[in-house]
Regions:
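Broad gene-expression machinery/nucleic-acid interaction feature
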Residues: 4-7, 125, 179
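Residue-level detector of secondary-structure boundary/capping sites
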Residues: 23-26, 119, 188
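Gly/Ser/Thr-rich active-site loops/lids in small-molecule metabolic enzymes
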Residues: 71-75, 114-116, 205-209
């Protein structure tokens, strides 16, 4: 068939995958420069892909999964992607966003929540149209088939959790039933908490995905922290 565009399909890069440089960010930039230089004279649109964290991108506040893949390596400057590249499609971060206000350098975002920290993220895809006139970019929003929910929003004692479960809608579990995370503040030993939760959920139109049993964590000042961010998962 006829070649109409080139794609720089770059996976997540580990040390040794990119040219030798003073740091990770510069090494990744050198690799993209080399790849783009190989095809830029052919007069066809170029699409770049990458699995990385770009400088200026936004990370979900409570979502640790967006940090673990990078493993502490430096962010990559958007300058790594030449202005002449028609579109740069990035992955790793789950929130749909432009990078440094560049319309054609984007994280499309996940089509559905990948964790309970993403319950408020807007879902959708980005449709790209590349022609002789330029690059057209359109965000297509949609509702996921099934959402995610956390009760309570912050960990609470078991009795309060059971009351919150009682307020959930009754019905059969279907493909549209939300995935449920339950957060319990364990102020005292409660060996039967899982059984009590499972019993309370019978007949509820939700799908239990996770029970996070948490202990209050004392700070050096002696104050007991009760917010979700400061709780230690058992």
């Amino acid at each position: 068939g006829e070649v109409t565009a080139y794609c720089l399909a770059v996976p997540y890069l580990r040390q040794g995958d990119y040219p030798s440089a003073e740091n990770y960010s510069k090494g990744v930039q050198l690799l993209y420069e080399q790849l783009f230089n190989e095809v830029k004279e052919k007069g066809l649109p170029v699409i770049a892909m990458g699995h990385l964290q770009a400088t200026g991108s936004e990370i979900s506040e409570d979502d640790r999964s967006e940090r673990t893949v990078i493993g502490g390596l430096e962010c990559v400057s958007p300058d790594a992607f030449d202005e002449a590249i028609a579109y740069t499609a990035l992955g790793h971060l789950h929130r749909s966003q432009r990078v440094s206000h560049r319309e054609n350098v984007r994280y499309s975002g996940t089509p559905m929540p990948m964790s309970f920290a993403e319950r408020n993220n807007a879902s959708g895809v980005v449709m790209i149209t590349i022609s002789a006139e330029g690059t057209g970019i359109e965000r297509l929003a949609f509702e996921p088939l099934a959402g995610v929910m956390s009760i309570p929003r912050q960990a609470r004692p078991l009795e309060e959790v059971l009351q919150a479960i009682g307020d959930l809608p009754d019905g059969d579990v279907t493909l549209r039933s939300p995935y449920l995370e339950i957060k319990i503040l364990m102020t005292e030993p409660e060996p039967s908490y899982k059984y009590k939760i499972e019993e309370a959920l019978k007949g509820k139109a939700v799908r239990l995905a996770r029970i996070a049993a948490m202990l209050p964590q004392k700070k050096a000042s002696g104050i007991v922290a009760t917010s979700y961010e400061e709780l230690q998962t058992i």
